[in-house]
């Protein structure tokens, strides 16, 4: 991973824990829950899913399946959300294609509240026309325009219990330090190598 890696205009090399020929996986600046990671094409001009070439597309979804399996194993998740917000009107917050992988659990399941959180996930990307469409989406048609900002994560009106995998309210989701993200990326890289070596069948996804 010597060559600089960018997420839109942002240098994210030290957040990357896996890289294939056309794709990479990185830890999150403001994860919704522990284990919330992103799959991103290396080519920064890929704004939408349809912008991928055939080789890029094959590599992208192969990487997605590998990291999906790994995150479920690593974080002992019962289920996984796989989310692509394809364009600003769909809630995409950074003008570079990316797929969210988010662990989910039987206990403290927040249901569809996770999608509200995705609407406010922000990597601070900007392109003039693209950002204008994003602002319009948030102002008149965004999910949050239809609901009030939540101060605590609830399900059916009941406040969720505390725990490491509980979805945090936006006020508690702070931008993480680079050193913290670098350490997490290094740990996940080591664990991913262990995961792949534990099952010879997984090498086909590399």
UniProtKB/Swiss-Prot annotation:
What GO molecular function terms would the record report?
bis(5'-adenosyl)-triphosphatase activity; bis(5'-nucleosyl)-tetraphosphatase (asymmetrical) activity; hydrolase activity; nucleotide binding; ribonucleoside triphosphate phosphatase activity
Q: Where in the cell is it found?
A: Cytoplasm; Nucleus; Mitochondrion
| UniProtKB keywords | Cytoplasm, Hydrolase, Mitochondrion, Nucleotide-binding, Nucleus
Its annotated function is as follows: Cleaves A-5'-PPP-5'A to yield AMP and ADP. Can cleave all dinucleoside polyphosphates, provided the phosphate chain contains at least 3 phosphates and that 1 of the 2 bases composing the nucleotide is a purine. Is most effective on dinucleoside triphosphates. Negatively regulates intracellular dinucleoside polyphosphate levels, which elevate following heat shock.
Which Pfam families is this protein grouped with? HIT
> Lineage of this protein's species?
Eukaryota, Fungi, Dikarya, Ascomycota, Saccharomycotina
What CDD domains does the record tag this protein with? FHIT
Reported EC number(s) for this entry are: 3.6.1.29
| Chain coiled-coil ranges | none
User: Matching InterPro entries, A to Z?
Assistant: Bis(5'-adenosyl)-TPase_reg (IPR051884), FHIT (IPR039383), Histidine_triad_CS (IPR019808), HIT-like (IPR011146), HIT-like_sf (IPR036265)
> According to the UniProt entry, where does the motif Histidine triad motif sit in this chain?
96-100
Q: What cofactors does this protein use?
A: Mn(2+)
Anything else of interest in the record? Present with 1920 molecules/cell in log phase SD medium.
**Primary location recorded for the protein, binned into one broad class:** cytoplasm
GO terms of biological process kind: nucleoside catabolic process
Q: Which residues form the active site?
A: 98 (tele-amp-histidine intermediate)
According to the record, the residues making up region (Disordered) are 143-164
The answer to whether keyword Cell division applies is no
Q: How does the record describe its quaternary structure?
A: Homodimer.
The Gene Ontology CC terms held by the record are: cytoplasm; mitochondrion; nucleus
Q: Which gene encodes it?
A: HNT2
Q: Which reaction does it catalyse?
A: P(1),P(3)-bis(5'-adenosyl) triphosphate + H2O = AMP + ADP + 2 H(+)
Q: What is this protein called?
A: Bis(5'-adenosyl)-triphosphatase
Q: How is the cofactor bound?
A: Divalent metal cations. Mn(2+) is the preferred ion.
The HIT domain extends over 3-115
């Amino acid at each position: 991973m010597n060559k600089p890696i960018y997420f839109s205009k942002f240098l994210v090399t030290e957040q990357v824990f896996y890289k294939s020929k056309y794709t990479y996986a990185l830890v999150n600046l403001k994860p919704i829950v522990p284990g919330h990671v992103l799959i991103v094409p290396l080519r920064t001009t890929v704004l939408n899913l349809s912008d991928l070439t055939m080789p890029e597309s094959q590599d992208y979804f192969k990487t997605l399946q590998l990291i999906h399996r790994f995150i479920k194993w690593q974080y002992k998740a019962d289920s996984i959300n796989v989310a692509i917000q394809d364009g600003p009107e769909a809630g995409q917050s950074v003008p570079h294609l990316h797929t969210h992988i988010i662990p989910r659990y039987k206990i403290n399941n927040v249901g569809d509240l996770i999608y509200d959180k995705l609407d406010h996930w922000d990597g601070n990307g900007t392109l003039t026309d693209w950002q204008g469409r994003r602002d319009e989406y948030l102002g008149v048609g965004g999910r949050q325009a239809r609901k009030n900002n939540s101060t605590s994560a609830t399900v059916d009106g009941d406040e969720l219990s505390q725990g490491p995998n509980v979805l945090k309210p936006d006020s508690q989701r702070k931008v993480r330090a680079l050193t913290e993200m670098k350490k997490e990326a290094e740990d996940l890289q080591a664990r991913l190598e262990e995961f792949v070596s534990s099952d010879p069948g997984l090498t086909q996804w590399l």
